[in-house]
């Protein structure tokens, strides 16, 4: 059951880093075209 805990921590760390970079830098890729 330790593998599940490591996977959860791994996903949480990557998620936090991804959102930190996404909110820190301006969105270069704009999905909504106005």
From Swiss-Prot:
Transmembrane segments: 3-23
Pfam families linked to this entry: PsbT (PF01405)
Cellular component per GO, a single term: plasma membrane-derived thylakoid membrane
Stretches of the chain forming a coiled coil according to its record: none
Endoplasmic reticulum as UniProt keyword: no
Alphabetical UniProt keywords: Membrane, Photosynthesis, Photosystem II, Thylakoid, Transmembrane, Transmembrane helix
Membrane-topology descriptor: Single-pass membrane protein
Keyword Chaperone: no
Entry's Gene Ontology BP terms: photosynthesis
Family in the record: Belongs to the PsbT family.
UniProt protein name: Photosystem II reaction center protein T
């Amino acid at each position: 059951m330790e593998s599940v805990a490591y996977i959860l921590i791994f996903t949480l760390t990557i998620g936090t880093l991804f959102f930190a970079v996404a909110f820190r830098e301006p969105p270069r890729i704009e999905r909504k075209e106005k």
